[in-house]
Amino acid sequence: MRVLVASRNKKKLAELNRMLEAANVTGIELVGLGDLPEYPETPETGATFVDNARIKTNDGVRHTGLPTIADDSGLAVDALNGMPGVLSARWSGGHGDDKANNDLLLAQMGDVPDERRGAHFVSSCVLQLPAQVAAERGMETEYAVEGRWYGRVLRAEQGEGGFGYDPLFAPDELPEGQEEQLAGKSAGELTAEQKDAVSHRGKALRQLVEILAQLAD
């Protein structure tokens, strides 16, 4: 079955495909927004991560008639009262300018002592099914899942992997058996597979994969 992933980020599609393969789920063809000839941009006007994900899945089902997955993820910094939060991608004013966002966060955290640099990533994922598909499969029309990844904000970027705030985030939780080897590393220094094992998105997507298995042809 074709399933729309309401994102133009190819890394997100690759991430979900890895999760499906790891769970031996076949028969799901993921389609990204970049694969569609025309698709209007969806404004992210929600007050929470799950609100934004739901806005995108509603649009996806309405425009394509396909089961649609969307996520909204971000970084919540304790010393900033949970911000950037839902504004993570556009914290510096533009949208998706990782360097500007990271530079601004570093400036805002410049005087914050180590013991107050706690933060966590949040990923809210929503799967919405067209009513007919849900009825045929005996499923709900909407599923929402969430994953969190706790750590702290570093004082300088480390690593060039991942995306977003990854180079500034030192996770508390690391892949089992690799804690000593990876101690002090940023999320931007982990491999994709290492991130999948422990990250907020990895946790949310594993829950989603269990649901997607019911759609496999």
Curated annotation (Swiss-Prot):
Pfam families: Ham1p_like
Cofactor(s) listed: Mg(2+)
CDD domains with a match to the protein in the record: HAM1 (cd00515)
GO terms under biological process: nucleotide metabolic process; purine nucleoside triphosphate catabolic process
Active site: 72
Entry's EC annotation: 3.6.1.66
Catalysed reaction, written as an equation: XTP + H2O = XMP + diphosphate + H(+); dITP + H2O = dIMP + diphosphate + H(+); ITP + H2O = IMP + diphosphate + H(+)
Enzyme type, top EC level: hydrolase
Cofactor: how bound: Binds 1 Mg(2+) ion per subunit.
GO cellular component: cytosol
Residues holding Mg(2+): 72
Residue sites binding substrate per the record: 7-12, 73, 163-166, 195, 200-201
Keywords: Hydrolase, Magnesium, Metal-binding, Nucleotide metabolism, Nucleotide-binding
One example GO MF annotation: dITP diphosphatase activity
Matching HAMAP family: Non_canon_purine_NTPase
Described purpose of this protein according to its UniProt entry: Pyrophosphatase that catalyzes the hydrolysis of nucleoside triphosphates to their monophosphate derivatives, with a high preference for the non-canonical purine nucleotides XTP (xanthosine triphosphate), dITP (deoxyinosine triphosphate) and ITP. Seems to function as a house-cleaning enzyme that removes non-canonical purine nucleotides from the nucleotide pool, thus preventing their incorporation into DNA/RNA and avoiding chromosomal lesions.
Family: Belongs to the HAM1 NTPase family.
Binding partners and assembly: Homodimer.
Name of protein: dITP/XTP pyrophosphatase
Species annotation: Corynebacterium jeikeium (strain K411)
Lineage, top ranks: Bacteria, Bacillati, Actinomycetota, Actinomycetes, Mycobacteriales
